[in-house]
């Protein structure tokens, strides 16, 4: 929200909705069974498509205006940033970029959560670089 306020002329409600809902499909993609295996639906569709389905179902019940739904769907579809990272479409709105970069920063910061206390430097496969864990 702070980023949206700093940028200005941003639909903060849409940013919040996108931030809360961009990964909602993971609730159906990943099972709650031991080991958290993927569901059949999850393997076949993936969380992005499943998020769209869930949001469409809710939007129909709430009678969300079509234009508003389209803006939210764009955020969900583009939250990985670009095609190379798995997004079916690339970010095209301020709100989509804000949600994408917030999600990306969150994923990067999570890489600092687990490390070997004996070695402050650790190679991170996801980021393909060494990270310094100073605390």
PLM features per residue range, with description:
Residues 100, 117-118, 122-135:
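N-terminal intrinsically disordered, cationic/polar leader segments
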Residues 3-115:
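Divalent metal-dependent catalytic cores for phosphoryl transfer on phosphate-bearing substrates
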